[in-house]
Structure formats: structure tokens, C-alpha cells
Amino acid sequence: MSWQHFKQTWLIKFWAPAPAVIAAGILSTYYFGITGTFWAVTGEFTRWGGQILQLFGVHAEQWGYYKLIHLEGTPLTRIDGMMILGMFGGCFAAALWANNVKLRMPRSRIRIVQAVAGGIIAGFGARLAMGCNLAAFFTGIPQFSLHAWFFALATAIGSWFGARFTLLPIFRIPVKMQKVSAASPLTQKPDQARRRFRLGMLVFIGMIGWALLTAMHQPKLGLAMLFGVGFGLLIERAQICFTSAFRDLWISGRAHMAKAIIFGMAVSAIGIFSYVQLGVAPKIMWAGPNAVIGGLLFGFGIVLAGGCETGWMYRAVEGQVHYWWVGLGNVIGSTILAYYWDDFAPALATSWDKVNLLNTFGPLGGLLVTYLLLFTALMLIIGWEKRFFRRAGLTPAKESV
């Protein structure tokens, strides 16, 4: 394989979602085994909100939620912080390789309102449920935590309401029509593309170098950044967004991303099971109303905002300003939840059991139940897709894998 062929195929063209999501599932499994924690982002965003408040004299470290998730240190001294920095770096490098970085402003003020409001709702819901589309879903279900199943189902329902809500006339922005005599060809500036590709390589090499230097003295932090770079490359090149997985189901009937997510969790689950059998403790959260309410809010919020936690991250570094607002909303929403946590927690979360399916059904039973539930979810998705297209008189498009 020549360099130019490799460059075009793997560094410039978008990747098929299914193998990329499966790769993310495998990578998240090794991340858990090596660092002892799961791939998650909103917990760290919540810490960012708390530390911003500290700069203004607010003693956020005294709040119950920050005692729970630990506000100590900085992003440079926390595993989650270094992993997220690696994700941003990986996303940015991948976007530069493909010359996919351009400052794009929101087309109307209503889009900014959507971004901030949706981000706040999603951030609040995610932290109420102790995780977003990662910790309470994609990496939560393979941890065999019952709360992740509650969250996943509630997120699907919330996203349905979000999809219906965003179709209201208030969110329809006017489209300016311009008369033309011929189609404009899509063009790229070769010199700009080459410069950005080189810059992307510098960013990539810089992130890898930073991670390796850190690993020499603090192995887990350095490895967390390396994993983050890998996660960032995957989500940007394959455009992995859980919002589109849910929204596309309800609006267009497309289920390709949703099925890919199921496959990714199925691959991850057996790996997590192996680590748990070797003695690594799984991350189990409260299976209470917090998971259901949080999932409903999160599902609604991500569709309103137009992006989930992974989706807004890669789109933000591509220059889509709309998603800067979504990210800001996420931090605000999660920080608001942290402020009110002590009021909500006893009734909605901490008085409920943390249910580990491996303990409830036994190791093999818990694994079997998880795969049965994943298979059921896959069948429901396939059934919905067929029903949607049958009612529309269409045939589902075959997508590359």
C-alpha cells in the first residue's frame, strides 16, 4: 500500500461507523483494564464547572456532589482530564488531516438558544444519572450496571420527544434561495489542504509526545492521554454521534449507527467481564429514579442541542461554533446539578441499590442476561427500521461497513 493510498483511505476519508464503534468498544475495554475507570467525559466537565466557581470564591469543594466525584487536582493531574485533553487533540488532528476545519457560525439566534438550552438539559440529566451516553450507556452497559439499562431506555424515549419538539415551526429557520445557472463544483485549495495535513501531523505527534513524556513519570496519566487521542481519532473520522443514532431512528428510520453501538457494547462486554473476573471492580451506580429522569432529560437535551457529549466535542474542534455553545451548556447544566445534588440525592439516587447484574444473576448469568438484552435491543431496532420504511413505501439503504 502506497503512502498516498493510506493517507486518502485512513487519514482523509471518513471511516465507516460500525467498525469504528466496535474499535471504540475494544479501546474502552482496555482503558478500563489499565486505568481502573471507564471512558467518560461529563464527570470531568462537572469538575471544570466547580473549579471555575472556585476561581470566583465559591467553595464548590464543600458540595456533596464534588465530594462524591472528587474535585481535587486539575485536568492535568486527573485521569479523566488527561483523557479528555487527548480526545480534543485527537479530534483536532483528524479534522486537520481531512482539511475539515472551518469556522462555521450558527445560522440564526434560535440555534444558539437550542444549543445552550439543550446543552444545559443534557448536562443536568447526564450528571443526575451519573453518566452520559458513555458512562451510563456505551461503557455503562458493559459494566453490567442495571442503572445503565434504565438510562438507555429513558434516553431513547427522551430523544423521541426531543425529535418531535425540534420539528415545531419555531425551530424552522428561513432558507435563502439563490438563483444559479449551473451547479457549483466542490473544490479544495490544494496548498491549504497540504498545510493543514502537516499541522494535523504536528498536533498528533505533539499529543503522542506529551503523553509518552507524562507516562515516564505518571504511567496512568500518560496512558489515559494516549487512549484519549485514540478515542478522538475514532469519533471524528467516523463522525460517531449518539444523538444521530437516536434521532435518525425517529425521523428518517436509519438505524446504522444505532446497530453499530449495539455491536460495540457487545464486543466490550466480554472484555469487561474478563477484567472483572480477574479482580478489577466494575463501576456500578444507583439503579433509581435518577437514572430514568436523567435519561429522559439527556435524550431530550441532546436532540434539542443537536449533539451528544462525543458529538459536540469533535464538531467543536472542526470549527462549528454552534457546538461551542453546546459544550458551554453541558458544563453549566452539570454544575447546576452538582449544586442541587444534596436536595435530590436521597430520594432519587443514594437510597436506591447499586445493582450489579453479575452479582444478581451470577457471573455467567449476568453475562448471558446482558447479551440477551443487547440482542433484544438489536431486534427492536431492526424491527423499527423495517416498519418505518415499509410504512413509507421505501427500502432501507444499504450502508458500507
Swiss-Prot record:
InterPro entries: Sulf_transp_TsuA/YedE, YedE-like. Residues 1-13, 100-118, 169-198, 243-259, 305-320, 385-401 are cytoplasmic. The chain crosses the membrane at residues 14-34, 79-99, 119-141, 146-168, 199-219, 222-242, 260-280, 284-304, 321-341, 364-384. GO terms for cellular component: plasma membrane. It is a multi-pass membrane protein. Pfam families: Sulf_transp (PF04143). Residues 35-78, 142-145, 220-221, 281-283, 342-363 are periplasmic. PANTHER family: INNER MEMBRANE PROTEIN YEDE (PTHR30574), SULPHUR TRANSPORT DOMAIN-CONTAINING PROTEIN (PTHR30574:SF1). Belongs to the TsuA/YedE (TC 9.B.102) family. This is Probable transporter YedE. The lineage of its organism: Bacteria, Pseudomonadati, Pseudomonadota, Gammaproteobacteria, Enterobacterales. The gene is yedE.
